[in-house]
Amino acid sequence: MAIHFFNEESKYKLKLKSELKQWIKAVAAEEGFKIAALNYILCSDEYLHQINVTYLQHDTFTDIITFDHSEKKDSIAGDIFLSTDRVIENAQSFKVSESEEMCRVLVHGALHLMGYTDKTKASKSTMTTKENYYLAKRTFDGK
């Protein structure tokens, strides 16, 4: 059960790493999953854009890209790349703290590895409902 945080071309200082790891593990457990290996890579817009172009052939900016490496149905493993530039900008746009937006994106990536998608209006609504539910269950101050 390893969760790691890395920075690539980003100077973002992630706070409360231990609390975040416990929270993400609790989310996975409630969804019926164990975490095998989960890597969060905090990066710049440019870095994530290059990954988007290279691996997904999408020439757009995004806040998150998730690569699933899971080998078992009840276990998740993957690399989750997230743009700290997008997190900061989205926090301002949505009028929430950077911490809250970061938590939303972190759980969003984990939910992708648990099989949730956001490709349709209905699936996006389900995912947002899950995000809101788990954000409300945090036991640490990330707001």
Regions found by a protein language model. Give the residues of each.
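Conserved ATP-binding N-box helix of the HATPase_c
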Residues: 111
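An acidic/histidine-cluster motif and surrounding catalytic segment
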Residues: 1-103, 114-143
